[in-house]
Every structure is written in C-alpha cells, then in structure tokens.
Amino acid sequence: MIRGRKGFTLIELIVIIVIIGILAAVAVPQYLDLTRSSANGAARGILGGLRSANSLLFASRIIGGTTAAYNWTNVVNNAQIQGVEYTYGTQTFTMTAGGYTYAFELSPTDPQAPTTPATIYCPATTTW
C-alpha cells in the first residue's frame, strides 16, 4: 500500500462531473428565462413611457388650444426614450431589448386634440 498519495479517485471525479452537469442543466434554462423576463420588463417600461407621453401630449394640446394632428415623432420626442434601440414609422414603433423585438402601434395614426385621442397598443403578434 502506497501512503501519502494525494488526488481524487476516478469515481470521485465522475460524481463531480455528474453534479456539475445537473447544475448546468438547471441553471441554463433559468438564465435564458431571466433574459427574456428582463427584456419583457424593459418593453413594458417603454410601452408605459410611450402611453404617458401620448397622454401628456394630448392634454397639452387641449390646454394650449392646438388642434393639429400629431404622430409617433411627437410621442417619441415627448417620451425621451434612452437605453434601447428603436425605430418608428407612421403607425408602428419597434424596439429591441435583450435580443428580442417588440412592436407597438398608434391608433389612429393621426390623433387630433380635443376630439380624437390616440391609443398605443401591442398588436396580436407581440408575445410577452
């Protein structure tokens, strides 16, 4: 019998590898779910900011007596969005967060105070 040998046996190494494999199998899906969850949170925050900006813009036009129609440019400038990539056209605002893309729509496309307020919503294709 050799005394003073240090190290791990093959069985001990296999047990450690199996434990690491189990931990990885549990941790990776949790990490991916957290990434999606944080991206959804960012999108919900931006949506809330856009809706608030839309309401403030509509109210300020009523108070100021302005009846001209407004569009996404006015809403986005009023929202002062930072930290995410986004583009917008006449009807759709598209943003990317965490590698996921979200789209919001303005309806009607030419809201006009004081009679025609706009609604910002997620189309049916947007999944949370």
Protein language model annotation of sequence segments:
Residues 11-17, 38, 43, 55, ...:
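Generic hydrophobic-segment detector
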Residues 38-64:
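Membrane-proximal N-terminal amphipathic helix
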Residues 2-35:
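N-terminal single-pass transmembrane signal-anchor helix
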Residues 20, 36-40, 72-80:
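Short alpha-helical interface patches
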Residues 55-128:
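Periplasmic/extracellular, small/polar-rich flexible segments of pilin-like filament-forming proteins
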Residues 7-10, 29-31, 43-47, 78, ...:
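Generic N-terminal initiation segments characterized by hydrophobic and/or small/turn-forming residues
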Residues 2, 16-19, 44, 60, ...:
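Short, flexible coil/turn micro-motifs enriched in small/turn-prone residues
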